[in-house]
A protein has these predicted regions:
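Active-site beta-strand-loop-beta-strand hairpin of nuclease catalytic cores
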Residues: 87-99
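Short, low-complexity, polybasic intrinsically disordered segments
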Residues: 171-202
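Short catalytic/ligand-binding loop motif for oxyanion handling, primarily in non-cytosolic enzymes
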Residues: 94, 106-110, 160, 177-180
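Short, solvent-exposed loop/turn segments at secondary-structure junctions
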Residues: 71-72, 103-107, 174-177
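Extended hydrophobic secondary-structure segments that form protein cores and membrane-embedded regions
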Residues: 99-101, 168-174
Length: 202
């Protein structure tokens, strides 16, 4: 991916960056819904800003630039992690790297138990790398969904690359039934367990 970016003229400009522009650009689905929501906002959408503002580290946060369909290379294969958007933001405590994953009713890809079925050496390498980036113990529970791991790792990787103080993975859900929220909570709980272990060791 070239380090050259052009301004967006509207939501339609996001379509050409999709992995499958025709199949994924559908009204009522996440890619198109997210594009219209974020293009219609001045900075962060209000509901996103309300969530970010709850974290002291994100006080007075503002986006510096937002890039649709941001790709981050990962070891273990040629497929990159492609977030719906990546934001480099600034708060009172410094730069913030944020990967954004839009959802309506779509899942977070397969749970690891399915994803690891007949896993190639490349998959094993990638999973170990993601665990190391996120500071998670091996093995990661099979119920955790793969997409949550590599999207969150992407935020951390880009934070290191751009010298950001903080990293966050944001799920912007448009689901009226909070579809897949339980799976997201399980992942957050796993991250919380890591923090508790770190505090106990200090």
């Amino acid at each position: 991916m070239k380090p050259i970016f052009v301004p967006s003229a509207g939501p339609g400009d996001w379509q050409r960056f999709l992995a499958d522009p025709e199949r994924h650009w559908v009204s009522g689905r996440s890619a198109k819904t997210l594009a219209h929501c974020w293009e219609g906002a001045e900075g962060f959408p209000p509901e996103v800003l309300a969530v970010l503002a709850q974290a002291p580290a994100f006080k007075n946060i503002t986006p510096l630039f937002i890039v649709p369909e941001w790709k981050v290379p990962l070891p273990g294969g040629s497929t990159e992690s492609q977030s719906d958007a990546w934001v480099l933001a600034k708060s009172e405590s410094g730069l913030v790297s944020i990967t954004v994953e839009g959802k309506v009713e779509e899942s977070f890809d397969k749970p690891l138990g399915e994803w690891k079925t007949k896993a190639s050496p490349g998959k094993i390498t990638r999973l170990e790398y993601l665990a190391d980036v996120l500071g998670l113990s091996h093995p990661i529970p099979d119920t955790i969904h793969y997409q949550l791991l590599h999207r969150t790792a992407s935020a951390v990787i880009e934070a290191n690359r751009f010298g950001a103080t903080h990293a966050a993975m944001l799920v912007h859900s448009f689901s009226p039934t909070n579809q897949w929220f339980t799976e997201f909570k399980d992942f957050v709980a796993l991250s919380a367990q890591r923090r508790l272990s770190e505090n106990s060791a200090q």
